[in-house]
Amino acid sequence: AVVNAGQSLLTRVQAMEMALDALIQQGRLLGGGVMELRGNGQLLRRPNLEACGGFNEHTVTDDLDLSFRLLTEGSRIGLLWDPPVQEEAVESVPALWKQRQRWAEGGLQRFFDYWPQLLSNRLSPSQRRDLACFFLLQYALPVVSFADAVTSAATRTVPVYWPLSIVAFSVSGLAYWRGCRRPSEGPELPQPDLLSLLMAIAYLGHWFVVIPWVSVRMAVFPKRLVWAKTSHRGEATADA
């Protein structure tokens, strides 16, 4: 539901990333895994929200944090492919860098905050397996791949873990293709032609820098909550 997908290459690949994310979330849900909230367009039942303690003001990503607390309380989360909510992709690399650092920090912090509950019997075996795979792919793989690339550059040897990265990017390319080919009642999704797919796959490489950087920063520096609102133009300008 990205309204400014056609504005630039950067907004185009972000729109494709949103379709990729929705497809992956749907697959996780259908496979008995864990579904997550997204900040744009949540519909919450008040009793479920109150049962898990409401919103957490000590996190930079309240949607991801709330996802885990709803999960451990036994609440189910569903997915609506065509929500009546639209969003704007960020329009510059500095804004993207700031946004993705916040997403990475909040996404990683919740594992540290709720790991006892995530390992308990509150979750089904399939949900625990899903979370383990998700953590390894989204957080561990970028850190290992970055360290592997730095080591190989320093020693002038071939990276050891490059096959894993290639598999991850290939699967992402397939998910891009499937997600962007689905019908949309909202803003039109970018067409998954070969050039767009290659650019979108290359764009995913920024996570292999953001995740390691945020992981090191969280390990070295004290926890600090710095939430910076992403600037938006608004409907009138976005349509121009």
Region roles according to the model:
Residues 65, 79, 84-108:
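C-terminal catalytic/acceptor-binding lobe
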Residues 97-139:
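Active-site-adjacent helix/loop segment of glycosyltransferases
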Residues 133-222:
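Membrane-embedded multi-pass helical conduit in multi-pass membrane proteins
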